[in-house]
């Protein structure tokens, strides 16, 4: 069964907490008590970035560049990998009411079957993986957790200028290109489409950049302003690429496409025949028969409705200064899920 939207947000990989904190930190970096004016202290590096690459990446057969980078820049590879994982989860949440929902696409660093085909869905996974890898590395850079990133001040002080880190964005984009682009591969039409969509993903990072500024001066006056570019949230980047996916273009040798377009080579197989929809949560009261409608989402296999009683936090309020106090409430839920049979294909 698919998780409810808010439950889904908290079901993530080993670095989910790291990325949540990073997103908060890069959006509004707090002043650390006792730190010099205009300075912030770098947050400690998460243990997962200190442990080196796991064996599946260290011995990856899909991408030779992953193997090499694991030996020289493991923190970069792990940040990219976890960024991709986070991106796939965002995609599954974003498309949870569509028949194909990213949930079984697989991480690009593991060479999933979907990326050996030129489907419309493949174009989204290529682009989203590329963008998410760049986002993961840029986010880690902004925190000073990657040693060779220009954002990390290695001058002997565990602090750096409050001015944001535009360098981290470019470092993330460069890392994504080097890690995910296959070098020396056969120059087939599929490979051309793959490279195009990977680049479109990297461009999505640039297209969604956000400008941030901080004023410097006495009593909050803006005598001097420091501005920098930072990455958007991964949710926003995912939304941007999902919209591109909806308008993806069929590619031929004489096609004229923009570098930001997603492109594909062949029609997708029927999702209802290619994969199982059993357990998918659907909207059985959807009278408009649009997104999430059980009749459409369940491919005509029918659906089941069950009643759940869950305990949730409610009526939350902050108690000065820093405690969040909530009541425990009982909530009744009627959940409809698709019936179905095992999948007939491993592609989706």
Curated annotation (Swiss-Prot):
Pfam families: wnt. It comes from the Eukaryota. Its main location: secreted. SMART domains: WNT1 (SM00097). Disruption phenotype: Cell fate decisions disrupted, protein localization altered and neuron translocation disrupted. Defective tail development in males. Defective in egg laying in hermaphrodites. Nuclear localization of wrm-1 and lit-1 appears disrupted. Similar to tau-induced unc phenotype. Deviations in vulval precursor cell fate are observed when knocked down in conjunction with cwn-1 and egl-20. Bivulval phenotype when accompanied by mom-2 and/or cwn-2 knockdowns. Increase in ectopic synaptic vesicle puncta. The keyword Lipoprotein applies. Disulfide bonds join 91-102, 141-149, 151-165, 213-227, 215-222, 272-299, 282-294, 298-338, 314-329, 316-326, 321-322. Glycans are attached at residue 286. Residues 1-25 form the signal peptide. Keywords: Developmental protein, Disulfide bond, Extracellular matrix, Glycoprotein, Lipoprotein, Secreted, Signal, Wnt signaling pathway. GO terms for cellular component: extracellular space. It is found in: Secreted, Extracellular space, Extracellular matrix. Palmitoleoylation is required for efficient binding to frizzled receptors. Depalmitoleoylation leads to Wnt signaling pathway inhibition. Ligand for members of the frizzled family of seven transmembrane receptors. Affects male tail development, vulval precursor cell specification and egg laying. Involved in morphogenesis by influencing polarity of asymmetric cell divisions of the B, U, and F cells in the male, and the T cell in males and hermaphrodites. Controls spindle orientation in B-gamma cell division during male copulatory spicule development. Involved in specification of the P7.p lineage during vulval development. Belongs to the Wnt family. This is Abnormal cell lineage protein 44. It comes from Caenorhabditis elegans.
């Amino acid at each position: 069964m698919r998780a409810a939207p808010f439950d889904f947000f908290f079901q993530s990989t080993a670095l989910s907490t790291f990325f949540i904190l990073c997103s908060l930190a890069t959006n509004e970096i707090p002043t650390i008590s006792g730190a010099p004016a205009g300075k912030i202290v770098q947050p400690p590096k998460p243990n997962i970035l200190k442990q080196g690459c796991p064996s599946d990446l260290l011995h990856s057969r899909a991408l030779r560049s992953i193997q090499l980078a694991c030996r020289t820049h493991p923190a970069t590879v792990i940040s990219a990998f976890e960024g991709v994982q986070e991106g796939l989860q965002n995609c599954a949440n974003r498309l949870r009411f569509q028949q194909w929902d990213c949930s079984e696409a697989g991480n690009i660093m593991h060479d999933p079957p979907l990326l050996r085909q030129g489907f419309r869905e493949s174009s989204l996974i290529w682009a989203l993986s590329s963008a998410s890898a760049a986002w993961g590395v840029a986010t880690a850079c902004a925190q000073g957790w990657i040693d060779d990133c220009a954002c990390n001040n290695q001058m002997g002080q565990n602090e750096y200028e409050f001015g944001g880190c535009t360098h981290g964005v470019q470092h993330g984009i460069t890392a994504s290109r080097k890690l995910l682009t296959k070098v020396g591969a056969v120059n087939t039409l599929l490979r051309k489409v793959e490279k195009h969509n990977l680049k479109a993903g990297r461009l999505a990072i640039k297209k969604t950049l956000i400008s941030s500024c901080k004023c410097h001066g006495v009593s909050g006056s803006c005598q001097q302003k420091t501005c920098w570019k930072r990455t958007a949230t991964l949710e926003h980047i995912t939304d941007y690429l999902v919209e591109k996916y909806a308008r993806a273009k069929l590619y031929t040798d004489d096609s004229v496409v923009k570098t930001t377009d997603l492109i594909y080579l062949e029609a997708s197989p029927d999702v209802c025949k290619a994969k199982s929809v059993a357990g998918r949560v659907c909207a059985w009261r959807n009278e408009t028969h649009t997104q999430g409608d059980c009749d459409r989402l369940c491919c005509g296999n029918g659906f089941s409705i069950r009643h759940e009683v869950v305990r949730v936090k409610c009526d939350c309020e902050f108690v000065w200064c820093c405690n969040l106090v909530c009541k425990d409430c009982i909530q009744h839920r009627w959940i409809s899920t698709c019936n179905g049979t095992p999948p007939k294909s491993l592609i989706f």
